[in-house]
Amino acid sequence: MATIHRPRRGSLAFSPRKRAKSQVPRTRYWAAGEEKARMDGFAGYKAGMTHIIMIDDKPNSLTEGMEISVPVTILETPPLSIAALRVYEKYNGGVRAAGEAWSDKLDPSLARSITVPKNKRGAAIDEIGAIIEDMEELRLIAHTNPKLLTGVPKKNPDLMEIQVNGGNIANQFELAKSLLGSSVPISSIFSPGSIIDVSAITKGKGVQGPVKRWGINLQKRKHSRGGKRRHIGNLGPWNPHHVRWTVPLLGQMGYHQRTEFNKRVLAIGSDGGAITPDGGFPGYGIIRGEYAILSGSVPGPSKRLVRMRSAVRAKDADLKTPQVLYVSRDSKQGL
């Protein structure tokens, strides 16, 4: 007999599958803070992938202490500029913004992305200092500097909020005041060996049919004589008189926000020429500034903004600094 039951094709966890509102991913959750206050995130632009040779330092691994080849992603990470700080208070089971203070030294390129507030640091920072003990969270408003990159063809900075974790709210406020108006390099946030999460907007695929979008089976050869093979055989019951949202249909595929957990930072450096492959990264070009090497792949195409944060489900957090022996610079052209 035919099988009566089978699991549904595709996951409903990410519905509705529509295009992301912005290319800047949203971070809704942050890792628990440590004893010392620190800025808990960063952002960079994806250049491409290559592979490295490193010493396997994972305990009890079959290749522990041996040389292994690891696929890696290269992110170009120019310093982030801290434009403002914002505090949040408890409200209705969550938090809401209670005040913000902007730097006196804003980058002129910021006016390309937003209307720059007229009120500056002075009185606002004092007002926040007076109520800081009653606040719940403190976040920094930072922006990227794509004008420093040759591989990203834009000048408009990407604006985002980055939470300050650790210590108490007063310690966080003092740290935020010291960072306001400054440029923060990635080396002051993460170090080789750090375990992080990455968020980005995936590659857009446009409108795709249900076979590619949901993974349903093709119609059998005999059933396809009606003229259709790459479609579902049933839209649902007579009642209710509408097509349910769970039915796999054609529609937008890709260009969704996705977060991948537990990526390991294998190296951080400032000499991009030492890791750029011959001929440059396809679709990106040459890395000229600071960079980070992450294990595995990250969502999105080249040139896409990638946000990083401390891992919220950290594994293997006790690993030592990675021993990277070789970074492949073989040409990626034609691959």
UniProtKB/Swiss-Prot annotation:
Signal peptide interval: none
Keywords: Ribonucleoprotein, Ribosomal protein, RNA-binding, rRNA-binding
GO MF annotation, one: structural constituent of ribosome
GO biological process terms on file: translation
GO CC term (a single one): cytosolic large ribosomal subunit
The UniProt record lists the keyword Disulfide bond: no
Cited Gene3D superfamilies: 3.30.1430.10, Ribosomal protein L3, domain 3, Translation factors
InterPro entries according to UniProt: L3_arc_euk, Ribosomal_L3_dom_3_arc_sf, Ribosomal_uL3, Ribosomal_uL3_arc, Ribosomal_uL3_CS, Transl_B-barrel_sf
Chain positions covered by the region annotation Disordered: 1-20
Function summary: One of the primary rRNA binding proteins, it binds directly near the 3'-end of the 23S rRNA, where it nucleates assembly of the 50S subunit.
Subunit structure, as described in the record: Part of the 50S ribosomal subunit. Forms a cluster with proteins L14 and L24e.
Cited HAMAP family: Ribosomal_uL3_A
Family that this chain belongs to: Belongs to the universal ribosomal protein uL3 family.
Protein name, as recorded: Large ribosomal subunit protein uL3
Species: Methanothrix harundinacea (strain 6Ac) (Methanosaeta harundinacea)
Lineage summary: Archaea, Methanobacteriati, Methanobacteriota, Stenosarchaea group, Methanomicrobia
